[in-house]
A protein has these predicted regions:
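Short, electropositive alpha-helical surface patch
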Residues: 12-22, 48, 108-125, 156-157, ...
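Acidic (Asp/Glu)-rich catalytic clusters
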Residues: 18-25, 45-55, 87-91
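Short amphipathic alpha-helices and their capping/turn segments at secondary-structure boundaries
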Residues: 39-55, 83-84, 113-123, 168
């Protein structure tokens, strides 16, 4: 359950959705993507029981540790919401993942390296990162068209250097699941590096 907010809804409806997925042949567990401000205590207690019987990882869309950035991109939650959600989830013995976007407006190289140290202080098990991508039809794409000077889009070598610096400031036990993302070419405005994910990983 990766797209959208997969913990939003009535508890019984969410239970039915998860349990239906677990009945599918060859499904060996659940990875549930959600927002840090959308995990109720009741659902967390239910998931604490689920993880006793199957693989379970809850992944939070953190995006940034900077509250000014979170307001700028209209996320509707704070970094403290992330800290609380991650600590509550990990405290239940549930594997806990995070997702961040590198290169959001106003965040410089040194800010992002500091972000890695900040994230290392919370009990994440896994982390996914990817570069800021401007997608056609989005509010941010419109903002880029109006004020491109507000955006710094990394070229591939610059982003590789950033990722290396970022990793060096992460806890060594964090499992890194992704360094880069690849949007459909017909939707992508920038940056267009012309690299497949595996090609980027090889260069890292």
């Amino acid at each position: 359950f990766q797209a959208y907010t997969n913990t939003y809804g009535e508890l019984e409806a969410l239970k039915r959705k998860y349990e239906e997925a677990l009945t599918v042949p060859d499904v060996v567990g659940l990875v549930i993507g959600t927002r840090p401000d959308c995990m109720s205590d009741a659902l967390l207690h239910y998931l604490e029981e689920v993880k006793k019987h199957t693989f379970l990882l809850v992944e939070y869309g953190i995006e940034s540790t900077n509250d000014a950035t979170l307001r700028r991109i209209n996320r509707g939650h704070t970094y403290q919401d992330t800290v609380d959600a991650v600590e509550r989830t990990a405290g239940c013995g549930i594997l806990t993942g995070g997702h961040v976007i590198l290169g959001l407006p106003g965040e410089r190289h040194e800010d992002l390296v500091a972000q890695a140290s900040t994230l290392s202080r919370i009990p994440l098990t896994t982390l996914k990162m990817h570069q800021l991508q401007l997608i056609r039809g989005t509010r941010m794409a419109h903002e880029y068209e109006q004020h491109p000077e507000d955006f710094h889009l990394f070229d591939v070598e610059e982003y590789i250097d950033l990722v290396v610096d970022y990793i060096e400031h992460l806890r060594p036990d964090l499992v890194l699941e992704r360094f880069v993302s690849q949007s459909p070419k017909e939707l992508l405005i920038a940056p267009d590096w012309g690299l497949k994910n595996y090609e980027f990983n090889h260069r890292i």
